[in-house]
């Protein structure tokens, strides 16, 4: 299994401005790829200088940019998220701003190639306002975004989240109902799937549509974004389920911001080694 099969999301550093050392640290811990968390206060995807720096840093570190996570807010300031960008908002101004920001993020591909755009459909239920999670508004947004992404050569991956629009069943239904869309897929976020129930059930439900993954753990009641094996998820079962539905990566570690982040990266590298061992064992079992 290649190093590029395992990525780290820069969500790990999202409270800081992205810099070269963040990518150096990811590469130094044996990861071959990165997912950029698009947030203007972290990585300003609208700034040509920031984009140029990213291209240089990726070249320096030999990291592959496998995916970009579309913005869900405009900024994080002193620990406070500002500028809601819900694609499912009934507020037309918010929704149109969100669509415009996603399209601006997709324009990155003209300078730095990536295959997948991870997208939130609405807002997690525990923090959502009454206007944030409307199915009709979400569909109108996606009717614009999915074709725009396809024209850029990028596939949209709708992320499993803890709201009614983003359960595995809901996302499968949304994609199947949108017969006029270019191919879209699902980002199976294992931590979120655990909060909804059994991740194995989620993986089986999304079978055939999984094009991306977020791997992180949870103790079962909060979206903790822990290093795998630090929470309640049975990873051997989950990884075998992924293999049974034909998903082979990338496995993107989307981990909570921590200080120092390098400690989290070291523990993530150990978890990656356990993944590699588990996937190898599962390969042997499935070939018998």
Locate each region found by the language model:
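Conserved, mostly hydrophobic/aromatic
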Residues: 26, 34, 58, 98, ...
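Short, electropositive alpha-helical surface patch
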Residues: 91, 126-137, 168-181, 262-279
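N-terminal pre-domain/capping segments
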Residues: 1-104, 110, 150, 197, ...
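Active-site groove signature of glycoside hydrolases
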Residues: 105-129, 157
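Acidic-and-aromatic substrate-binding clefts and catalytic sites of carbohydrate-active enzymes
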Residues: 11-19, 37-51, 124-129, 161-168, ...
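Acidic/histidine-rich catalytic cores of soluble enzymes
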Residues: 4-5, 33-34, 133, 139-232
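Aromatic/hydrophobic pocket-lining residues that form the small-molecule binding cavity
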Residues: 19-20, 51, 95-102, 138, ...
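Non-cysteine beta-strand/loop elements that form the S-adenosyl-L-methionine
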Residues: 66-71, 119, 207-219, 253
